[in-house]
């Protein structure tokens, strides 16, 4: 299964957007995402970092991922900035439990 995961307020707190240098990890969510990686799922992080400012945050984000122990296959920085995302395959971290794979079916 290919799983796209947002970064800010999903696997880290970013209290001073757009200054991502002060972001800090949400360890519990990183562990959940890493478990999905370890189970063989393809993990792609997709972020809107720099979408409004034009700043390229790739190098800094990759450094943060290394420091935080984030496992992933790909990092995409071209996510558009939006206020609300409505989708048929969406999940909120408040309800994140790795049993969702069994609930929706695993095409891995």
Give names to the regions the model predicted.
Residues 1-108:
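Catalytic phosphate/metal-binding cores of nucleic-acid and nucleotide-processing enzymes, i.e., regions
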